[in-house]
């Protein structure tokens, strides 16, 4: 399908589960031939089925899902990953759709700096007609560059976080200098933000050790939608196994990865998530202009 916006790289599968976009990086696929993307999607079904076997299915289905519990994921790379003709065409529609649905907003970072600045500009534009701020997630650049970025985003930010898992992300590899952050560096970053601090990309035992030491305001469980080279596994299973421990060291848990339906959202909330984040379905819904239908799949009030 070709439109004035470009050509969507998503294959528009009937079920978005990571099997239709194998090897598509750049694009909307994942590393390891999409393995973690696939496991993320399957993980919510497995958790629900396990709960169902214990007689807890009705308890999960009874959980009310309202827009305030959902966020659009932090997304950049509209040209190379999504298929937009121009990077600037993506951010305002994507964030505006989420804001109008009542969802929280997340804004991502990328290379070149224009990508972050376009996200900032979109949030600024939204504030001409509503009052809204976003959670901004910065790539793990060297500290001085991060401090500069904090100044760009702080007026429009409700939360500021770092993608700790993206220091070796395939789509930015060899383009910029990214670092694997230490606890001391994260503490230094946090002190500069002066806002609620999020560690995004928590998915391994090493990440858990960082959380214990830093004790952020928010832990964001993520494997970058299966797009970073990390251990094999699903965010759903990590949430189920680690939520009770993580709660000791943070105020909230956010999670993404494979969220497609209301039942997925309910399952995430049941297993300990405070906020549930979706990206690929909302990207496609923005491009194809069927956002209302996608919202109905994710929630009810």
Give residue spans per PLM region.
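Active-site entrance/lid segments in N-terminal catalytic domains of soluble metabolic enzymes
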Residues: 2-209, 213, 225-228
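Charged helix-capping and loop-helix junction motifs
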Residues: 89, 177-180, 233-240, 291-294
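Catalytic cores of alpha/beta
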Residues: 144-154, 203-216, 241-255, 259-276
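Glycine-rich phosphate-binding active-site loops on the catalytic face of alpha/beta enzymes
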Residues: 165-166, 214-233, 267-293
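Thr-Gly-centered strand-to-loop micro-motif
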Residues: 199, 229, 255-256, 278
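Hydrophobic, well-ordered secondary-structure segments
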Residues: 225-244, 248, 252, 288, ...
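Extended, intrinsically disordered, low-complexity segments
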Residues: 293-301
């Amino acid at each position: 399908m070709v439109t004035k916006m470009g050509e969507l790289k998503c294959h528009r599968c009937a079920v978005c589960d990571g099997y239709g976009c194998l090897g598509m990086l750049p694009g909307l696929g994942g590393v390891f031939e999409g393995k973690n993307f696939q496991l993320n999607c399957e993980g919510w079904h497995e958790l629900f089925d396990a709960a169902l076997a214990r007689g807890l299915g009705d308890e999960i289905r009874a959980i009310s899902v309202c827009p305030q519990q959902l966020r659009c994921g932090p997304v950049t790379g509209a040209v190379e990953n999504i298929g937009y003709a121009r990077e600037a065409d993506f951010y305002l529609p994507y964030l505006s759709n989420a804001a109008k649905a009542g969802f929280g907003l997340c804004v991502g970072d990328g290379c070149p700096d224009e990508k972050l600045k376009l996200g900032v500009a979109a949030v600024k534009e939204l504030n001409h007609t509503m009052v809204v701020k976003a959670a901004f997630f910065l790539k793990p650049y060297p500290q001085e560059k991060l401090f500069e970025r904090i100044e760009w985003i702080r007026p429009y930010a409700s939360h500021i976080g770092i993608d700790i898992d993206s220091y070796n992300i395939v789509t930015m590899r060899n383009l910029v200098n990214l670092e694997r952050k230490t606890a001391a560096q994260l503490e230094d970053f946090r002190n500069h933000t002066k806002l609620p601090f999020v560690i995004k990309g928590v998915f391994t035992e090493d990440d858990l050790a960082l959380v214990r030491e830093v004790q952020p305001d928010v832990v964001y469980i993520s494997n970058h939608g299966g797009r970073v080279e990390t251990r094999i596994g699903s965010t759903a299973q990590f949430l189920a196994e680690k939520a009770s421990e993580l709660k000791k060291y943070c105020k909230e848990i956010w999670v993404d990865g494979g969220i497609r339906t209301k039942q997925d959202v309910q399952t995430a909330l049941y297993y300990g998530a405070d906020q549930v984040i979706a990206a690929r379905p909302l990207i496609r819904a923005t491009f194809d202009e069927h956002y209302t239908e996608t919202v109905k799949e994710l929630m009810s009030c």
